[in-house]
């Protein structure tokens, strides 16, 4: 079709007038340009000096009007050219939706989303805008609901809506806490699951505001908000250049080092329990961001066991616990009356089973972070009107996992022994 002569002064003047009008009239703080790889009179090759000169000229004019304005490019050029434009001060979209979707669906062999990290592309500046969803890509939760890993449907079925939304949390924890700007597509924070192709790719989609009243979706909204607030309120940590990542395997981790606060993000993307070594920056007390539980680290290379889809964000500064809607499992535990205390504990833990008196028996066990079973027993029906006392006086200080299973339901809790 027809195209502008990008080298024409008239074309450049027109572009500058339009950009300046939007900046001054509407006080916008950024402009995203579609397919800037086409801003040239040459072919859409991966490396084009004419295009580079034209884009720099346009950006300079924009910054002469507002030096702080975000210039965002949907470019899709060679990495060398994108790096050059990034070094100049422009931000570029980084499409990692395929790998994020594979990770959320539980297909770990294709779940490496390292390309969402600007360092992984050899860039100097954190100007890579990574994202989970966009207007051009399929919805994460549609794929999770439709194609998620269901190879163990009776144990852990990714296609179950509760499991799928938890895995959306897992992916979000990494996406939003990897240093660099992010793009959040509309309703992603509520697990929008209407396909991009329903009824057609560019057809209007329903605005499902009622998702706000669905607790399991409201929880994802709360988690997303809490993640963004965490990085905003602790920008020194989450903008640090001193960070490391391991995103290629079934368990993934992100390590952020900073003089004010260190942080570790760990997650299990498999459909089985897995051990992960967070590689804590130092010994001492670390805190789980969402639960506010403390973890005493006596070995920097200690291993933690994560359930399928589980993630944790540890900081070495105690933060205010965010307000998050309870998950289905947490609500179930609360409704069924399972409670234990004290936590942290020293010599014993008291477990309250009083609301479980309608079942025959339950299997109970406590494991350490290596997965070794330390206590295992069967709790019979007559015990359910009591508070059971568990002796933990012989346990070394650290984090342990308590599991209660009955009639297909499993309740997991973390216990800290001091």
Language-model-detected regions and their locations in the chain:
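C-terminal outer-membrane/trafficking sorting elements
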Residues: 331-341, 345-418
